[in-house]
Amino acid sequence: INAPLKERRMAGLVVEPGERFQPNETMNLRLKGPKDSLTRLRANDLRLRLDESSVQKGAGGRWTARVLVEGLPQGVIRLGSVPRVDVRRGSP
């Protein structure tokens, strides 16, 4: 299939908290894929989950975790490095 490709930025996406950690911020994603798929894609279609097994203490004592992106339509890819977000310990 020779569909025209398009790039799209989605800003302010909410990351679901894990059992022990919560994200400090929202995420921005860069996506690339068929124009019709990206045009129809809404923030509600995506699920961004905190990967608690990847929590690391970074520079300056900040804790970060990898974010798993689920729900991308077929043919749509995420551009850039693996998304990470600053986290804090959740309330018990």
Residue spans for each PLM region:
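Structured interface patches
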Residues: 1-92
